[in-house]
């Protein structure tokens, strides 16, 4: 027996009625169970139809499984000893022996986890030491730690703006910025990627609308394109129109700029960027965790009102200890920074010799443009068969008809590794005719 939910209530006896003590109650239970099964079938079909649509459009994303530590050469369940050209392991530190030693030692001194948010009982000396070290490294006044940079961006904009303010965001900003901006009550504006003329137009619109405060936010590096933001132009306009500048430097902190201080150093605008967000999950060891660094008053306000900070567990002590060690290494030696950038330049020059359409410049991210989603997956699969691990990116990660294989160079790659990767791409180019 099956009934519609709207009619089911009429069949349920009053709890005070003697019917509840009769065999009728078992009938009601059977009806309820049947109704629940029907609803479950409808729900399952609804979501399965969405999944089938994704697969039919060639947009299904597979997760390959790695069976070794993250490194330049890895094993997967599909192939052994493949060269990894799709990790954010820019400095090659994800499996660094010194960092593993520091992490192991930290367990003895600080334990495994904190089981608390920061303001209750989740702050150790190691957390404050890392915040101070990051502030010194980035030449900012103060720093606050988050479980991820996604949380850092998610908890920033609603905290520092009100409905009287305006947020002007680059159209290609990371999803975490987009989601963070959505949470804010401020009026939102979006400007064309790295387009200073359009940014100025949006600043004028915000002024005309009576915005009390204005915040410009951009990725330091647009991660799908390998393009570095025009921070000189952004800072010039921010000063002209009295706006704050926020830069997400997740794909820059630790390896972009002469000493790895990020895009502000690369663009020569250190001291002109008000707020920097970033991650420990890429160049700085590759584990997890994020941060926001900037003016002391802003950081203090985040400690008081930023919801991801107040309601998420603190960063694990071992991550703090290893990140401190990475900052120490970068402060003492630029060799890893130089190596990853040299590798990127070499890879780009060799790929251009074969006529590949490459996006971006001056960065370890070198996207190989293929435009077709299905082709990007076929090429990625064929590359793995040739011993090269890369991933095809397509909608909704990138715009439709802009599919690509995003390669990422690491300081751990050798010239021979890069030559093998270029050779495999060249063979795929001939095989698939792109």
Which residue stretches match the model-derived regions?
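Short hydrophobic alpha-helical segments enriched in small aliphatic residues
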Residues: 3-5, 21-22, 27-30
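N-terminal "arm"/small-domain region of PLP-dependent enzymes with the aminotransferase-like
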Residues: 44-112, 243
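Active-site phosphate-binding strand-loop segment of PLP-dependent enzymes
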Residues: 89, 189, 193-247
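PLP-dependent enzyme catalytic core of the Aspartate aminotransferase-like
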Residues: 97, 101-105, 109, 132, ...
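Conserved N-terminal alpha-helix of the aminotransferase class I/II PLP-enzyme fold
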Residues: 101, 105-149
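Conserved PLP-anchoring active-site segment centered on the Schiff-base-forming lysine
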Residues: 156-175
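Active-site C-terminal subdomain of aminotransferase-like
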Residues: 241-244, 251, 256-362
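Conserved PLP-binding catalytic core of the aspartate aminotransferase-like
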Residues: 338-347, 352-387, 397, 401-402, ...
